[in-house]
C-alpha cells in the first residue's frame, strides 16, 4: 500500500511517553495537527546530567491525564469524534512507555476505539508527513539520543534499515562531549550554539568505516575529544570550548550528511527526510541543505524544531497510516523497550 488516499476524515489521538516528554495530540488525516501538547521534564533531570528512569515514570503518571485532557480540549473534539488511539509502544524506557500504553489501552477500551501501537522511530519519520507529502521511494536520516539510522522506504510502513550506528548514537556522543566541556544537560543544543561561535581548527577523526557501508560510529570521535581535552589539561593548556564544539560538530555532521547523500544517490530516491531530536541541530540542517544541492531532483524535507523532539503528533501521524492499513493492536499490547523497527 504505497500512496494512501482516503476520502473520509480520520481523527487520531496520539500519546507519547517513551522518555522524558509526556505528550498527547490530535491529528486529522495523518497530516494536519489539530492539537499538540508536550509537557517536558527537562528541568527535573538536568541536575542529574541525564534522564533518570524512575523520575521520568513518576512525572508521566502525574501528567498523562492532564496532557490528554488538554489535547482533546484544544482540538475541540470529544472521544466520540475520534477514530483511533495511537501510542508509542517502544523503544524507550520501559516504565515510561508503560504509562502511555496503559493510558491508551484504558481510553480505547472505555470508548470502544481501535488501539494502534506505534514504533517511536516510525513516529519520528512520520513527523515529516505533517509538513510535506511523502514521496516514495524515500530515505530518512534519523538522528536522536538513542538512534542514528538511515532508513529506506519503498512505501508507507515498509522500512529497510540500510545504515545504523555500531556504537554510540550521535545524540549520545553530543551529551558525553558536552559533559566533558562542562556544558549542562541536554548537551546537543549547547554544543550547536557554541559551534557557531568557534572554528573547526582541531583535527578530529571521521569514521567512514569500510567502502560502501552506510553504518556510523561515533565512539572513536568521542574518545578523541576526551583524550585531546585530557592531554591539554595534563600539559596545563587551555582548549577553547567553542573551537572544540565546532570541530566535534563538523566531524559528526560531515559523516552524517555525506553518507545520507551517497545513499540517496545509490537508492535513487525522490525524497530525503531528516528526523529525530538531533534534527533540530542548526549545523546539521544547514549542512544537509548544502550537500543536497548535489541532487537537484530530490526533495529535502526538514520538520520544524517542535516536531523534531519527542511529540505525540508524529505518533498520531504514523498511527493513522497503520489505521488506514487495517493494522490494530489488541488490549494485550505491552511496552517493549527494545521494539525492532523491522
UniProtKB/Swiss-Prot annotation:
Pfam families: TsaD (PF00814). It is an enzyme of class 2 (transferase). GO terms for biological process: tRNA threonylcarbamoyladenosine modification. SUPFAM superfamilies: Actin-like ATPase domain. Signal peptide: none annotated. PROSITE patterns: GLYCOPROTEASE. This is tRNA N6-adenosine threonylcarbamoyltransferase. It comes from Geobacillus thermodenitrificans (strain NG80-2). The lineage of its organism: Bacteria, Bacillati, Bacillota, Bacilli, Bacillales.
Amino acid at each position: 500500500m504505497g500512496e494512501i488516499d482516503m476520502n473520509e476524515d480520520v481523527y487520531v489521538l496520539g500519546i507519547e511517553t517513551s522518555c522524558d516528554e509526556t505528550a498527547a495530540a490530535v491529528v486529522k488525516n495523518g497530516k494536519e495537527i489539530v492539537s499538540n501538547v508536550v509537557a517536558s521534564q527537562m528541568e527535573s533531570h538536568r541536575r542529574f546530567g541525564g534522564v533518570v528512569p524512575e523520575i521520568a515514570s513518576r512525572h508521566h503518571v502525574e501528567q498523562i491525564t492532564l496532557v490528554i485532557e488538554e489535547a482533546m480540549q484544544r482540538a475541540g473534539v470529544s472521544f466520540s469524534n475520534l477514530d483511533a488511539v495511537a501510542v508509542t509502544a517502544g523503544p524507550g524506557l520501559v516504565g515510561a512507555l508503560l504509562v502511555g500504553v496503559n493510558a491508551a489501552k484504558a481510553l480505547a477500551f472505555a470508548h470502544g476505539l481501535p488501539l494502534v501501537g506505534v514504533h517511536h522511530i516510525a513516529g519520528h519519520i512520520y513527523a515529516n508527513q505533517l509538513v510535506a507529502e511523502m514521496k516514495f521511494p524515500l530515505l530518512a536520516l534519523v538522528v536522536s539520543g538513542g538512534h542514528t539510522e538511515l532508513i529506506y522506504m519503498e512505501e508507507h510502513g515498509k522500512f529497510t534499515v540500510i545504515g545504523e550506528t555500531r556504537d554510540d548514537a550521535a545524540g549520545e556522543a553530543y551529551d558525553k562531549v558536552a559533559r566533558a566541556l562542562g556544558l549542562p544537560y541536554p548537551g546537543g543544543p549547547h554544543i550547536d550554539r557554541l559551534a557557531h561561535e568557534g572554528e573547526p581548527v582541531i583535527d578530529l577523526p571521521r569514521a567512514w568505516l569500510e567502502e560502501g557501508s552506510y553504518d556510523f560510529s561515533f565512539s572513536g570521535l568521542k574518545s578523541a575529544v576526551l583524550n585531546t581535552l585530557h592531554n591539554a589539561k595534563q600539559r596545563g593548556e587551555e582548549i577553547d570550548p567553542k573551537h572544540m564544539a565546532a570541530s566535534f560538530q563538523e566531524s559528526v555532521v560531515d559523516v552524517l550528511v555525506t553518507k545520507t547523500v551517497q545513499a540517496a544517490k545509490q537508492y535513487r530516491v525522490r525524497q530525503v527526510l531528516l528526523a529525530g531530536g538531533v534534527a533540530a541541530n542548526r549545523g546539521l540542517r544547514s549542512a544537509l541543505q548544502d550537500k543536497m544541492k548535489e541532487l537537484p531532483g530530490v526533495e529535502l524535507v526538514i520538520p520544524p524544531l517542535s516536531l523534531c523532539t519527542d511529540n505525540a503528533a508524529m505518533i498520531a501521524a504514523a498511527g493513522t497510516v497503520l489505521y488506514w492499513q487495517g493494522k490494530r493492536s489488541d488490549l494485550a499490547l505491552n511496552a517493549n523497550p527494545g521494539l525492532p523497527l523491522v
